[in-house]
Amino acid sequence: MKKKYNETIICFNIITIFPEMFYAITNYGIIGQAIKKKIININFFNPRNFSKNKYKSVDDRPYGGGPGMLMSFEPLYLAIQQAKSTSKNVTVIYLSPQGKELKQNHIEELLVKKKKIVFICGRYEGIDQRIIDNQVDEEWSIGSYILTGGELAAMVMIDAISRLIPGVIKTKKSIEEDSFTNDLLDYPNYTRPKIIKNMSVPQVLLSGNHNEIRLWRLKQSLGTTWIKRPDLIKKKY
């Protein structure tokens, strides 16, 4: 008997001037299916809808000069207030290169502690500092590089958090054996055929001996991690 999910487990409210960018995850794949099942809920709040000038602009020149434009305080503030008003105990997250760099253990902590998240997706040269100082609870970065906006970073976080929610991914074991779950990279995986272009699947995987397979996979994970991400080994041991 299939389990039914009668209430949303987590809600994401997204502040963005480009909500259409999110159709890639809301309409397709595992996240799209989770939305249809009502396991997760995603809403959008466009700052342009809160702009009070006839051009619906949401940016302005920075005080003190400098290149580019900043997202203005008022449209962002009003969008955040509406996003927060939809539920209680909301956490407001700003996606920024200045934020704490996101790791798998942070994703797990966010899922446990935060059930209602507002993501602020910046654009241009960033947002008015007063929003960060007075409206943002946490700043997160997905890596030490610059994107044109926070939308892709928000999608990364939504995907990473959502896939840990019961019912989003059918096979629990797939999550338990993912890369980084135990601070190790994944082991090599193979599918049919057994031999292609003179390349064979390792014999141990065809043996049916589950203990030997488990040991082989552990050795491969350790070896791959040591070669490609030795920092993970040093952190753990």
From Swiss-Prot:
Disulfide bonds: none annotated. GO terms for biological process: tRNA N1-guanine methylation. S-adenosyl-L-methionine binds at residues 122, 142-147. Specifically methylates guanosine-37 in various tRNAs. The keyword Transferase applies. GO terms for molecular function: tRNA (guanine(37)-N1)-methyltransferase activity. Its main location: cytoplasm. Keywords: Cytoplasm, Methyltransferase, S-adenosyl-L-methionine, Transferase, tRNA processing. It comes from the Bacteria. Homodimer. It is found in: Cytoplasm. PANTHER family: TRNA (GUANINE-N(1)-)-METHYLTRANSFERASE. One of its GO terms (cellular component) is cytosol. Its EC number is 2.1.1.228. This is tRNA (guanine-N(1)-)-methyltransferase.
